[in-house]
Amino acid sequence: MRSKPVVIGIAGGSGSGKTSVTNSIYEKFKGHSILMLQQDLYYKNQSHMPFEECLLTNYDHPLAFDNDLMFEHLEQLLRYESIEKPIYDFKLNTRSEETVHVEPKDVIIVEGIFALEDERLRDLMDIKLYVDTDADLRIIRRILRDTKERGRSIDSVIEQYVSVVRPMHNQFIEPTKRYADIIIPEGGQNHVAIDLMVTKIQTILQSRAE
């Protein structure tokens, strides 16, 4: 009988370095059986809404995410079943009609600002991480990402950060830190923490293979 996959949850504020940590762990297992499940792709489908209304969506609130679908997909992957992972179009502010076929793997990384917010998702995780990074650095990273990758202006990113992102972080994201098994400061630059995580994952995999 095949052993259960190892699930790692990686949470933290926008621009904290979650993706860097995720990519670092992924690279360490390159060539092995590992996949990434990005919460950013699981924003709720808004294709039925006018574009102007979609622009008002608060993407930093827990209710913006389709956690029901993410939970369903994670359960399928834990049963070694394939899924059709959604694609989110950040320029159109809605879910794409296309999907990505994903085969199950032995290691699953769930990454997102609210990766630890939903109890159902947490209960499926073997290791829960929170990436803790200074707020000034997080806003700089967010500006760079949203202007380059999501077609946003600098002014709109800053306005959104002050009016939405920062208060949502303080109210909803920061409190999920208490659910973390490990808190990683300085994101992807903390190579010691990442190496320790890789060792822990390998230990769990070996124990389940015995």
Curated annotation (Swiss-Prot):
Q: Name one Pfam family in it.
A: PRK
The residues listed in the UniProt record as binding ATP, with positions renumbered to this chain, are G12, G13, S14, G15, S16, G17, K18, T19
Molecular functions per Gene Ontology: ATP binding; cytidine kinase activity; uridine kinase activity
Q: Does the keyword DNA repair apply?
A: no
Compartments (UniProt record)? Cytoplasm
Keyword terms? ATP-binding, Cytoplasm, Kinase, Nucleotide-binding, Transferase
E.C. no: 2.7.1.48
- What are the annotated GO cellular component locations? cytoplasm
Main localisation: cytoplasm
A Gene Ontology BP annotation from the UniProt entry: CTP salvage
Q: In which pathway does it act?
A: Pyrimidine metabolism; CTP biosynthesis via salvage pathway; CTP from cytidine: step 1/3; Pyrimidine metabolism; UMP biosynthesis via salvage pathway; UMP from uridine: step 1/1
Catalysed reactions, as listed in the record: uridine + ATP = UMP + ADP + H(+); cytidine + ATP = CMP + ADP + H(+)
For whether the record's keyword set contains Iron, the answer is no
The text of the family note is: Belongs to the uridine kinase family.
What is the protein name stated in its UniProt record? Uridine kinase
- Organism listed in the record: Bacillus pumilus (strain SAFR-032)
